């Protein structure tokens, strides 16, 4: 499935999310978020979800007319397209799943995150929140040339 099939549901999700965030924001405050980042994270999560959780994720993201394989292929196409840079342009995208130490996700989930979402997987100790946050922030800084 072409990444272009993600445009309408991702735009609808982005505007709904903005509307929700804006309703809760303090007056005069700016809202800064990455709709693509959030929809990608939830889509990666959906690869490992089943049952009601999967249905809720797909409904929220507007993917109800598609199956998981189609969504995975569309994101794979999107990240392949984003990976092509021109000499005077650069766009860095980084996806990752931070897994709680001691928890082992299913191998298929790990493979799908890597294959379809160009995602990295690393373990974090969630009992040490500051260290976990630092690891995640370091990953982001490295991916964004910060």
PLM region spans:
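Flexible propeptides and autoinhibitory/regulatory segments associated with cysteine proteases
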Residues: 1-56, 142-146
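Surface-exposed loop/turn and secondary-structure junction residues enriched for glycine/proline
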Residues: 34-39, 45-47, 60, 64-66, ...
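Active-site-surrounding "flap" and adjacent substrate/cofactor-binding loops of secreted or lumenal enzymes
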Residues: 45-81
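Short alpha-helical "patches" and their helix-cap loops
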Residues: 30-35, 52-65, 108-118
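Non-catalytic, conformational "gating/processing" segments within enzyme and secreted inhibitor domains
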Residues: 28, 68-146
